Amino acid sequence: MRATLIGHAGIFIETRQGSILCDPWFNPAYFGSWFVFPRNDQLNAELAKAIRQPNYLYISHLHGDHLDEQWLVDNISPQTPVLLPDYPTKELERRLRHLGFTHFIATSDGIACDLGDDLSIAIHVETSITDGPAGDSALVVSDGVHRIVNQNDCRTSDLGALLAHGPIDLHFLQYSGAIWYPMVYDEPAQRMRELVDLKVESQFARAMRYVEALNARAIVPSAGPPCFLDPELFAFNDIAKDSFSIFPDQTKFIAQLNAVQRHGIINIPGTCITLGDDIKVLHPIAEADVQAIFSDKESYLRNYQSDYLLWLEDMKTTWSQESPDLLTTLKLWWEPLLAMAPALRRGVGAACLLRAGDLDILIDFPNGEVRPFNNEAYGFRFEIDRRLVETVV
């Protein structure tokens, strides 16, 4: 069995019985705010061809850095069998059917599914509110000899259930941040420093708990961090020592693994890991060049950014422009939702100011009303580029 990293949480798993393509993400996500790091737009031709012809497709969950809809439409046959997590809702299946996929292999949460000839998979799902739309999932793959756990960014609550399938050779695991907290909050610098440090520490602590519980032969840092090439967001990359960033790179996680004598594998898109009596790692470039990506990260990111600045400019021209009825549209959309959610309104307990460019909108949670802001008291404030609000609406 071998696993080739293709960027972020993307993994191409090859066994003698067939291949599984996991979470391929290539197009910048979230309105161009997230890019794959290290970049994966330069895979060699052989690998680029192979990942377009998998025997199975696995999409862990609905987030844009895992479900790259445009790439799937452009590159993967809709006849490819999809390994479907056992979510309580059908949202992921509906999205994939909308893209043209028709062959789904339904799984039961945590139960091994025999794909034939000693190839088996099990998908473990999590469905708490923090797991996002429809939930999140982790994949266990066994070829009868070796076993991989692709936990990606799934916060698995029952780690014993993952381990119950047998000893683990490779554990793919998120360790870095994947949200904008706390950087986008309005906090004094000292408080922001405290919040950022606490967030990074908690991320590492959670990842190390998973590492100790699963006790794999090797741990592969996965599912982040992304990088930020938009000039307005570039400062959120973990470059300067005093930056307010929750996105440490692999080298810092590897250092933590080394400190407790765990085998961590640094990787970039194209890194191939082959399982046998030994674990063999082959990078697509020289080891020194791999290390340079992280040791000279700012230079690497600036070069990467230069290739996408025009793309970013063009992408922003596609955002919806100002319309005269944004307030009315939001009022008609949100007030019925507020009426359906009295417990939520009580929980929020205050009004929220939405500042969309020069338009100020008050979302009055206690009274379930959306109206123009008239200098009333409010408990929360969001400042969002109006073009983004218009585009989402």
Language-model region placement:
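Catalytic core of the metallo-beta-lactamase
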Residues: L5-R16, C113-D169
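Pre-active-site segment of Zn-dependent metallo-hydrolases
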Residues: Q17-L62, E69-D74, D131, T156-P167, ...
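Active-site neighborhood of phospho(di)ester-bond hydrolases with catalytic His/Asp-centered motifs
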Residues: L21-D23, Q53-D65, L83-D86, V149-C154, ...
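Active-site-proximal loop/helix segment associated with metal-binding centers of metalloenzymes
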Residues: W25-A29, W34-F35, H124-G144, C154, ...
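Active-site HxH/HxHxD metal-binding segment of metal-dependent hydrolases
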Residues: Q42-A112, L388
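Metallo-beta-lactamase
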Residues: P85-H146, P248, A255, I266-I268
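Cap/insert and terminal regions of metallo-dependent hydrolase folds
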Residues: L159-V260
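Feature captures hydrophobic
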Residues: I266, I273-V393
